[in-house]
UniProtKB/Swiss-Prot annotation:
Residues 277-306 form a coiled coil. The keyword Coiled coil applies. This is Uncharacterized protein 306. GO terms for biological process: tRNA modification.
Length: 306
C-alpha cells in the first residue's frame, strides 16, 4: 500500500526523501518540489467552517498545480444520505481537467443503495475511488462503525484510497487499499512523541520524564539504521521527529491487536450479504450515537448560558 503524507510546509523534510505527499488546496499556493503530489479539495474544511468556496474556485486552483492526483470536491456525509451535488462537482472537474488522469471521487458513509449508486456513477469515469468519513467519525467517537463500508466498497472498486489515517492500526484494517493518506505523524511529533512498534507512543521531549527507555532507544536506532533513515537521530528537532514517525509508519511491519483490528478481521471474512446487514445495523447505531452527542452538546451549552 502507498502511504501519502500530508504536509503544510515546503520546508518539510519528507520532500527531501521523495515520499508521496498530500497538500490541501486551501493552504498551499504552489508546488515547488518533485515529489509525487496529491491534492485535497478541502471539502471537509469547507463544510466544517461553512466556507464560501465553489467548485469553480477549486478548479481554478487545481489548474495551477502540476500534480499526480486530485480529489474531487465533495460534501461529506457522516452516516447520512448522499448529496448528489457531489456527482455534479466530480463531472465538472473531470470534464474541465481532461488532461489530468486522476480526479478521484469520494464515497462516504451512505445507506447501501446510495453507496451502490455512487460506485456505479463514478465507475463510468474512473477505477480509482476514495473512501471518506473516517476522520469525522473518529472525532465523534464512532470510528469503529465505519469499517463495514470499506470492506463492502473494496469488493466493487478496482483501486481504492482511504482518506485520513489517524493511527498505525489503520494500516492493518485497510491493508487491502491501494493508498492511504495521513497527517498523524505530524500531530504525534508536535506532542514530542514517536510511534512505537506496537502502535503505542513514546514521549521523547524534555518537559517531563521520557517514556522511551534506553533499551527501546537502542531498538529504535537499530531499526532506523537497518532501514537507512537519512537524517541524524535528534529528538529535540520536531522536523526530525515528524520524519521518524513517517518513516516508522512506512517501514514497520504492524501487528496490532485491539478492538478495531479484531472487528476488521471479522469483517474481512464476511460475504456481501453479511456486510450489508452490518452496514444497516451500524448506520442505525451511529446515527443514534450522533443524535445523543448532539443533544448532550446542546444541553451543556444551555447549562453554561444559565
Amino acid at each position: 500500500m502507498k502511504i501519502v503524507f500530508g504536509i503544510v510546509s515546503s520546508q518539510d523534510l519528507l520532500i527531501k526523501i521523495n515520499f508521496p505527499i498530500l497538500i490541501n488546496q486551501l493552504r498551499n499556493k504552489k508546488i515547488t518540489w518533485k515529489n509525487e503530489t496529491w491534492v485535497d479539495s478541502g471539502g471537509y474544511q469547507i463544510a466544517l467552517y461553512n466556507l464560501k468556496i465553489s467548485v469553480k474556485d477549486v478548479l481554478e486552483k487545481y489548474k495551477t498545480y502540476n500534480a499526480y492526483a486530485f480529489f474531487s470536491l465533495d460534501i461529506p456525509s457522516i452516516f447520512s444520505p448522499l448529496d448528489r451535488k457531489n456527482f455534479e462537482y466530480f463531472e465538472y472537474l473531470y470534464t474541465k481537467m481532461e488532461y489530468i488522469e486522476r480526479i478521484i471521487p469520494v464515497i462516504h458513509l451512505y445507506p447501501t443503495r446510495e453507496v451502490d449508486e455512487a460506485i456505479d456513477f463514478y465507475s463510468q469515469y474512473t477505477d480509482y475511488i476514495a473512501f471518506g468519513g473516517i476522520i469525522a467519525s473518529s472525532k465523534l467517537k464512532i470510528l469503529i462503525y465505519t469499517f463495514p463500508w470499506y470492506y463492502y466498497i473494496r469488493k466493487y472498486v478496482k483501486r481504492l484510497h482511504v482518506l485520513g489515517m489517524s493511527a498505525p492500526y489503520f494500516l492493518q484494517i485497510f491493508d487491502t487499499a491501494n493508498s492511504m493518506d495521513t497527517t498523524t505523524y505530524t500531530k504525534t511529533a508536535s506532542y514530542r512523541e514517536i510511534f512505537w512498534f506496537d502502535g503505542t507512543r513514546r514521549y521523547v521531549g524534555d518537559r517531563k520524564e521520557r517514556t522511551l527507555t534506553k533499551e527501546e532507544e537502542e531498538k529504535l536506532f537499530e531499526f532506523l539504521d537497518k532501514t537507512n533513515f537519512p537524517f541524524e537521530y535528534d529528538f529535540s528537532n520536531v522536523k526530525i521527529l515528524k520524519t521518524m514517525n513517517a518513516w516508522i509508519l512506512k517501514y514497520n511491519n504492524w501487528n496490532i491487536k485491539n478492538k478495531y483490528t479484531i472487528y476488521a478481521e471479522k469483517l474481512r471474512k464476511m460475504g456481501l450479504d453479511s456486510l450489508v446487514t452490518e452496514i444497516i445495523q451500524n448506520y442505525k447505531i451511529a446515527n443514534e450515537l450522533k443524535k445523543e452527542k448532539q443533544q448532550n452538546k446542546k444541553k451543556n451549552s444551555i447549562e453554561l448560558e444559565e
